[in-house]
UniProtKB/Swiss-Prot annotation:
Signal peptide: none annotated. Mg(2+) binds at residues 73, 123. This is Cyclic GMP-AMP synthase. It catalyses: GTP + ATP = 3',3'-cGAMP + 2 diphosphate. NCBIfam families: cGAS (NF041078). It comes from Bacteroides fragilis. ATP 2 binds at residue 109. Cyclic nucleotide synthase (second messenger synthase) of a CBASS antivirus system. CBASS (cyclic oligonucleotide-based antiphage signaling system) provides immunity against bacteriophage. The CD-NTase protein synthesizes cyclic nucleotides in response to infection; these serve as specific second messenger signals. The signals activate a diverse range of effectors, leading to bacterial cell death and thus abortive phage infection. A type II-A(GA) CBASS system. Belongs to the CD-NTase family. B04 subfamily. Transmembrane segments: none annotated. Its cofactor is Mg(2+). The record marks 54 as: Important for nucleotide discrimination.
Length: 341
């Protein structure tokens, strides 16, 4: 089995946001917070916004896409509840961020998205809540095409934090799966779905991220074959796959099967270059090709198997120094140790 753990560790590094972009992202999100606070202080002083970073950035699973883009979710909370419609609250936040230098705000259904020319975007979902320190009360998310709906992103973060505790490989597995979805795109599930599936069905293999990923993919497939669903572990506990029609479901499962087939071939391939090409096919161009060489451990195993076969067939010889399967030496006695009958 070609051990490509080194290539996987390098690949994980390639998926990380650069220091420069991370600094720009944080600076931009701080500037947006300031703009929103100033807007409400001037135009709606009865409402004071507070903020909470959520989503993949909070969980530590953000990746750079193949287009070198990334994002950050910054929840905008109003406590106590403003007695206005959800779209009104969204419109006010939209007004607050309009005119941001180097950026274009977009009013989406469940957030205000600020797209930056520098290659990242910041989502501003808007919430309201009656009491600040009441953990039994779930926030209400403003929806453009509706009113409000219960949504508690903190529960998702807390759930994932419990899964990743003393389990750093989980973050890497989530990143690999998100890169797979980013490579294929189209009908593939969102990053949150892959985060949930990896967390629920993770398989571990110490020191071998390639095997851990292969086995986790198989575990996910088994679960989805039994029940094609992905329930969010937080209020409102919705199923991310509920809207998938049979065509999209079949396409995703076909892609999953193809990935597993190639992952099996890669793990069992002794040539590192050939194995890395199989992984690269699904994980994208940032997965580095390995040297064109056979795995040392697999070569040793092949030699041992060869010696074993010659011992079993009675054609092995032993050299004067004790090495079996020498070019010259004393012919071995036929093997008769077949265990207890």
């Amino acid at each position: 089995m070609a051990n490509l753990d080194t290539q996987f560790q390098e690949f994980y590094g390639e998926l990380q946001i650069t220091v420069t972009k991370k600094q720009a992202l944080i600076t931009s999100h701080n500037n947006l917070r300031t703009k929103i606070q100033k807007y409400f202080a001037k135009n709606h002083p009865e409402y004071v916004p507070s903020f909470y970073i959520q989503g993949s950035y909070k969980m530590g699973t953000t990746i750079r896409t193949r287009d070198d883009e990334c994002d950050l979710d910054d929840g905008c909370y109003f406590i106590p509840k403003p007695e206005v419609k959800g779209i009104t609250l969204q419109n006010w936040v939209m007004d607050a961020v309009n005119g941001t230098v180097g950026a274009t705000p977009v009013h989406k259904n469940k957030c205000i998205r600020v797209n930056y020319a520098a290659g990242y975007h910041i989502d501003l979902p808007v919430y309201r809540k009656e009491r600040c320190n009441d953990n039994t009360e779930h926030p209400e998310l403003a929806v453009r095409d509706g009113e409000y709906e219960l949504s508690d992103p903190r529960e998702i973060v807390q759930w994932f934090n419990s899964k990743k505790k003393d389990n750093p490989v989980l973050i890497r597995l989530v990143s690999y799966l998100k890169s797979w979805c980013d490579t294929v795109r189209g009908f593939m599930p969102p990053g949150l779905a892959m985060t949930i599936l990896a967390s629920k069905y993770q398989k571990k293999h110490e020191g071998r991220d390639d095997i851990a990923l292969r086995d986790t993919l198989k575990s996910i497939r088994t679960a989805l074959q039994a029940n094609f669903s992905c329930v969010v572990p937080g209020t409102p506990y919705d199923d991310l796959f509920e809207s998938y029609d049979s065509n999209r479901q079949e396409k995703f499962m076909s892609e999953l099967n193809g990935f597993i087939e190639d992952a099996d071939r890669a793990v069992n391939e002794k040539n590192k270059l050939k194995a890395s090409k199989l992984w690269k096919k699904h994980l994208g161009n940032r997965f580095h090709l390995a040297p064109d060489e056979n795995d040392a451990e697999m070569s040793k195993l092949d030699k041992l198997r060869d010696i074993g076969n010659k011992v079993l067939t009675g054609i092995a010889t032993t050299a004067h120094n004790g090495y079996i399967h020498a070019a010259e030496g004393v012919k071995n006695v036929s093997h008769r140790n077949y265990g207890n009958e």
